[in-house]
Regions:
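A contiguous strand-loop segment
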Residues: 2-134, 154-303
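Short Pro/Gly-enriched beta-strand edge/turn motifs at strand-loop
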Residues: 60-66, 152, 349-357
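Glycine-rich, aromatic-lined ligand/substrate-binding cores of catalytic
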Residues: 232-379, 383
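Histidine-centered catalytic/metal-binding microenvironments
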Residues: 453-544
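Surface-exposed intrinsically disordered loops and tails
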Residues: 115-122, 349, 481-488
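Substrate-recognition/cap regions that form aromatic- and gly/pro-loop-enriched pockets
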Residues: 339-475
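Short, well-ordered beta-strand elements within core beta-sheets of diverse protein domains
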Residues: 138-144
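Short, charged, surface-exposed loops that flank catalytic or proteolytic processing sites
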Residues: 144-150
C-alpha cells in the first residue's frame, strides 16, 4: 500500500511505551473500506491459500486470538494491515517500498504464473503460485508468536521458503522492542531494531541506512537478516561502500562464485545497496520523511539554502533522537499532516499554486485508516496494548483508543458496509472529508474541536478503565505482570471478566464516536451547503 510509517522507541515515547503507527493508503483512484475486528483461534485458517498469489501454506494448529483492521472486501484477500495478539505482540504490514534493478536481477520476485494451455495437452504448463505479500503476512505471523523477535524469525523463514512478489517493510513490536523488516528481492530480508531512544520514519522507500553485518551474524542484538545475505551481496556485487577492500580495513571476503571473492564491510548502507533514489522518490517519498523529522527536531535548519536536509534529500536519516519525547498526539498529527507551515501545504496560503501541490502529503484523500499500536509497560498484560484507530482521510478525523485484548469489537467499527452508509465510522468519516475539503477554512474549526474532544475523551476512558482493572487486581496479586486477570492466567471466569471490562470501554468509545462524528457531519454539511456555488442569499417573501 502507499503508506507512511512512524515508529517510536520506548525511551523516545512520552510514557515508555513502544509505538508503531502507519497510514494505510489505497492506490490512486481506489478507496478500500476498512473495519476493526477480533479473530478467535477457531476462525483462523489451518490451511491458507492466498487470493492474489495462490500460494498454499499449512498453518500451526495453535493460533492465539488477535485483533486487526482489515479491508471489508475480500477481493484481494484478508489484508489484515495492523493488529495485536493476546501476547501483546503488534504488527503493521506493509509499508510498500522499492528495490533497485540490481537486486531484482539477482533475486527476482516470486510472481504467480497462470497455467498455460489445456490440462490434457502435451504443451500444458501448470500454474506456478507466487510468494507471500501484504495480503498474507499478518495472518501468517501474528497468531503464532509471543515476542517481536519470534515474529521476525517466523517472517524470515516464510520469506526464505515461499518468497514474495512485492517489496515491503513490516513492523513487529512488543513491550520491549520494535523491529523493522525490509524484503530484499524475492527471498532475502534485513531487519533492524529501532533504538530505544529514537523514532524512525518510513515513506514508501527502502529506508534502513545502516546495517551491522557483524552483529547480524553474531550476537544479533540490533540486526537480523536472511542466512545467506553476505554471499548474496558478494555474488551480485551489491555493496557500494567506498574504501580499499582489505580485511585490515574492516572488510571480510566472501565467495562471489567463478573462483573469485569479494570483500564486504562489517557495516554498510542498505538504502544505497538495495534501494532507489529517483525523481519520483523526490516527489512522493523523501518530502514525507523530511516533514516528520522537521516537526520532531524543529530546532534544526530545515528551510534555509544551507539546510542539511531538504524535501528532496536522499540521505534523510532512517532514525534519530527526537528533541522531546513523542506523544500519541504527535503521531496522529504527523500521519494526518499536509506540510502545515510550509509552502507545500495544499490547504495553505503561502508559496504558489505550484508549490502547494509539488509533493505528496502524508494525509491524503485515499487513506483507509491510521492505526497506532501502543504497548504499555506500566499496566498488566491484559490491558497492555491499545490500538489508536482512525478511518478515512487524516486531516478530517482523529485517532481513538481501543483495547486490543478482546473477543469482539464495537459494531460501529466492525460492521463497515461495502457501500456508503452513515451507520458506521468509516463511511461517515469519508463523507465528512469530501464535504469539508472544498471549504477547509470554514469547516476546520469544527474538525479541530472534534479531534481534540476524541483524543481527550479517549485518554480519560483509558485511564479510568486501567484504574478499574487495577482495583480488581489488588486483592489478587501485586505482580502486575502475572495477576490472575491478565488474560493468560487464572480461571475462565476471571479472564472473561477482564474481557467484559475492556469490551465495555471499547463500546463506550464507539458510542462517543457515533454521537460526535454524526454531529461533525451535520456541522460541515450545513456550513458547506451555505457555500455552494449556486447559493443565493435572497429568499422569497414567504420564507421564514
Amino acid at each position: 500500500m502507499s503508506c507512511t510509517t512512524i515508529l517510536v522507541g520506548k525511551n523516545a515515547s512520552y510514557d515508555g511505551s513502544t509505538i508503531i503507527a502507519r497510514d494505510d493508503d489505497s492506490g490512486s483512484g481506489r478507496y478500500d473500506p476498512k473495519r476493526f475486528v477480533a479473530v478467535a483461534p477457531d476462525d483462523q485458517p489451518r490451511h491458507y491459500r492466498s487470493v492474489l498469489s495462490h500460494v498454499e501454506i499449512e498453518l500451526p494448529d495453535n493460533p492465539c486470538r488477535y485483533t486487526i483492521a482489515p479491508n471489508v472486501l475480500n477481493n484481494r484477500g484478508i489484508l489484515a494491515e495492523a493488529g495485536a495478539n493476546e501476547h501483546n505482540v503488534a504488527m503493521s504490514a506493509t509499508e510498500t517500498i522499492a528495490v533497485n534493478e540490481r537486486v531484482l536481477g539477482a533475486d527476482p520476485m516470486v510472481e504467480l504464473r497462470p497455467a498455460v494451455g489445456e490440462p490434457d495437452s502435451t504443451d500444458y504448463q501448470a500454474e506456478q503460485p507466487g510468494g507471500i505479500g501484504e495480503e498474507d503476512i499478518i495472518t501468517l505471523v501474528l497468531p503464532y508468536v509471543t515476542t517481536a523477535r519470534e515474529g521476525v524469525a517466523r517472517l524470515g523463514e516464510l520469506l526464505e521458503t515461499y518468497g514474495t512478489y512485492e517489496s515491503n517493510g513490516i513492523i513487529i513490536s512488543d513491550v520491549n522492542e520494535i523491529w523493522y523488516v525490509e524484503t530484499i528481492g524475492g527471498h532475502h530480508w534485513i531487519a533492524r531494531r529501532v533504538p530505544d531512544d529514537c523514532y524512525a520514519t518510513i515513506p514508501n522507500q527502502l529506508g534502513i541506512d545502516d546495517f551491522d553485518l557483524a552483529d547480524a551474524f553474531g550476537e544479533q542484538r540490533e540486526y537480523l537478516c536472511s542466512a545467506d545475505l553476505r554471499e548474496f551481496m558478494a555474488m551480485h556485487h551489491l555493496d557500494r561502500t567506498m574504501g580499499t577492500p582489505v580485511s585490515s580495513n574492516g572488510r571480510h571476503a566472501h565467495s562471489a562464485g567463478f573462483g573469485t571473492t569479494v570483500a564486504l564491510p562489517t557495516r554498510f548502507n542498505p538504502r544505497k545497496a538495495f534501494g532507489t533514489a529517483t525523481p519520483k522518490d523526490h516527489i512522493y517519498n523523501t518530502p514525507r520523511a523530511w516533514y516528520m523529522q522537521r516537526r520532531l527536531n524543529p530546532s534544526e535548519d530545515w528551510d534555509s539554502p544551507a539546510a542539511r536536509y531538504t524535501p528532496e534529500s536522499d540521505d534523510i536519516p532512517w532514525c534519530r533522537v527526537p528533541e522531546d519525547k513523542v506523544s500519541l498526539e504527535d503521531v496522529d498529527f504527523l500521519l494526518s499532516s499536509h506540510f502545515e507551515g510550509t509552502p507545500y501545504d495544499p490547504y495553505g496560503t503561502t508559496g504558489t499554486a505550484e508549490s502547494r501541490h509539488r509533493y505528496r502529503p502524508i494525509g491524503v484523500n485515499r487513506t483507509g485508516h491510521m492505526v497506532a499500536i501502543q504497548v504499555r509497560p506500566y499496566v498488566p498484560a491484559a490491558n497492555r496494548t491499545v490500538m489508536w484507530v482512525s478511518f478515512g482521510s487524516g486531516p478530517f478525523t482523529a485517532a481513538a483508543p481501543f483495547y486490543a485484548n478482546v473477543n469482539d469489537t464495537p459494531a460501529y467499527l466492525r460492521d463497515t458496509t461495502p457501500e456508503v452508509s452513515t451507520g458506521n465510522l468509516y463511511w461517515t468519516n469519508r463523507l465528512i472529508a469530501v464535504v469539508a475539503d472544498a471549504h477547509w477554512y470554514e469547516t476546520n474549526r469544527f474538525i479541530e474541536g472534534y479531534a481534540e474532544g476524541v483524543r481527550a475523551f479517549g485518554h480519560r476512558l483509558i485511564e479510568r478503565t486501567d484504574e478499574q482493572l487495577l482495583a480488581r487486581s489488588d486483592a489478587e496479586s501485586t505482580d502486575t505482570n502475572a495477576w490472575p486477570l491478565d488474560g493468560g492466567h487464572g480461571d475462565e471466569k476471571d479472564v472473561q471478566g477482564v474481557a467484559d471490562v475492556l469490551e465495555a470501554a471499547n463500546d463506550e468509545m464507539a458510542d462517543y464516536l457515533r454521537e460526535h462524528t454524526t454531529k461533525l457531519l451535520n456541522d460541515v454539511l450545513y456550513t458547506s451547503s451555505n457555500l455552494m456555488h449556486n447559493s443565493f442569499a435572497m429568499s422569497d417573501r414567504w420564507a421564514e
